[in-house]
Amino acid sequence: MSDNFAAVGIALVVAIAINLIMMLMPKLLAPKKPVPEKLTPYEGGNQTIGRTWLGFKSNYFLYALVFTAFDVETVFLFPWALSFRQLGTFAFIEMFVFIVILLVGFWYAWKEGALEWM
């Protein structure tokens, strides 16, 4: 059993070492003198006037959050549905409560406008 852990540990150390090497190589091999052309903005080469960082409202995370909740529900529902006959009434009640909690959360998100676009 400890041989399996040793193999996982060695693989982890090798993966970390490869990542560190790949992150350090550009810093070691890149030219050190900054060229003025590389410091100019790309878009047309024009110097910007005023504030250049414009914030925008992104609601994708709300959709991702709701999707993740229902994706987790699917992960729990699939094995439960496959072994439904062996589990009995108690498992049915537990899964029913789980689905009700998720539906209440979905209803609340809908009511609060979390699913409205912009």
Curated annotation (Swiss-Prot):
Gene3D superfamilies: NADH:ubiquinone/plastoquinone oxidoreductase, chain 3. It is a multi-pass membrane protein. Pfam families: Oxidored_q4. Coiled coil: none annotated. Its EC number is 7.1.1.-. The chain crosses the membrane at residues 5-25, 61-81, 90-110. GO terms for cellular component: NADH dehydrogenase complex; plasma membrane. PANTHER family: NADH-UBIQUINONE OXIDOREDUCTASE CHAIN 3. NDH-1 is composed of 14 different subunits. Subunits NuoA, H, J, K, L, M, N constitute the membrane sector of the complex. This is NADH-quinone oxidoreductase subunit A. It comes from Desulfitobacterium hafniense (strain Y51). The lineage of its organism: Bacteria, Bacillati, Bacillota, Clostridia, Eubacteriales.
